[in-house]
Amino acid sequence: MAATDIARQVGEGCRTVPLAGHVGFDSLPDQLVNKSVSQGFCFNILCVGETGLGKSTLMDTLFNTKFEGEPATHTQPGVQLRSNTYDLQESNVGLKLTIVSTVGFGDQINKEDSYKPIVEFIDAQFEAYLQEELKIRRVLHTYHDSRIHACLYFIAPTGHSLKSLDLVTMKKLDSKVNIIPIIAKSDAISKSELTKFKIKITSELVNNGVQIYQFPTDDESVAEINGTMNAHLPFAVIGSTEELKIGNKMMKARQYPWGTVQVENEAHCDFVKLREMLIRVNMEDLREQTHSRHYELYRRCKLEEMGFKDTDPDSKPFSLQETYEAKRNEFLGELQKKEEEMRQMFVQRVKEKEAELKEAEKELHEKFDRLKKLHQDEKKKLEDKKKSLDDEVNAFKQRKTAAELLQSQGSQAGGSQTLKRDKEKKN
């Protein structure tokens, strides 16, 4: 019997019974809170936007501190993601905050692939968590979760419409991260222009099918405030770490020749709304949505690529063991097929090599025969030449002998005549 069937039977047959006295499991929420507080929390924010829109300043303002960071320039050859992690403490609650900023976003002439490094970074964090989950010995409670929980998308305060770069990037990211669009440096445009700009942005997002993060309304305790805040998206924000004295209080504000803009004055901007929604009310929901929605989508796609499925082709439940066995058999079949292909390839290559060697041997024999015949011909020529030379030598010797004989005969005849003449003179 499958585990799902057992669970279903237990659920259907479960009875509600009263307790005769106090047991103690009502302290489970307190236990969970104490454990969570002791372990601490992590929250990862991705700031996407063009250089100079005040991403770093807004982060400083949101968390009421000064994060150390290098200023970005407009001369980056491509988009780079810069990640910094900080340990924050508020009361007795610890928060490991990671801020990831897109350096050089929108600064290139060709912006077609500007979104790719961002998508690759988000997927890399999902992949790292998945690899940790798939380990035999998992230590997820000590693992530093680097998955992005919230993406603050900074929109330039043009007052007209979204840039094509913004639409393309948000469309590529909406299935991977919780996008919260915000209008940066909103004090650069008038209130009437800002209202029209918000409407225009919302309309373009809907028309292009971009899914932004909606504050949850299923929890009664926050349903009203979240429903109200959803209507204010995208938030128009201003960031400032400078404090000015307004009345009798020191407040974060920006001083202009025409007046003062207070960061925490809701009549001036939506900074307080953003801080409340992002940190105080919905931080845990953002973490949960990242794990249960975006990460699960990535995990499911990856496991399906690996061949793991929950159901067979007939939509019947498929256990992990059955999936493993099916995948193992498939792998063994592929392995045998590969082995047979390699064997056939090896045999074919051996035959080809044998044919090459036979052809080479034949060529060597033919070359040997040619050289042998050439050697014999040369030898015969040399023998004929030697015989001819020997004949010439013998003929020369014969001629020499004859000449010497004639010479000796001539010498003897000459001597006889001389003696004869001498005798005649004496007489």
From Swiss-Prot:
Pfam families, per the entry: Septin (PF00735)
Origin superkingdom: Eukaryota
Residue segments, region G4 motif: 184-187
Annotated stretches, region: G3 motif: 101-104
GO biological process: cell differentiation; cytoskeleton-dependent cytokinesis; protein localization; spermatogenesis
Residue numbers binding GTP: 49-56, 104, 185-193, 239, 254
Region (Disordered): 405-427
GO molecular function annotation: GTP binding; GTPase activity; molecular adaptor activity
Other remarks in the entry: Coordinated expression with SEPTIN2 and SEPTIN7.
Summary of subunit composition and partner proteins: Septins polymerize into heterooligomeric protein complexes that form filaments, and associate with cellular membranes, actin filaments and microtubules. GTPase activity is required for filament formation. Filaments are assembled from asymmetrical heterotrimers, composed of SEPTIN2, SEPTIN6 and SEPTIN7 that associate head-to-head to form a hexameric unit. Within the trimer, directly interacts with SEPTIN2 and SEPTIN7. Also interacts with SEPTIN9 and SEPTIN12. Interaction with SEPTIN12 alters filament structure.
UniProt-recorded name of the protein: Septin-6
Organism, scientific name: Bos taurus (Bovine)
Upper lineage: Eukaryota, Metazoa, Chordata, Craniata, Vertebrata
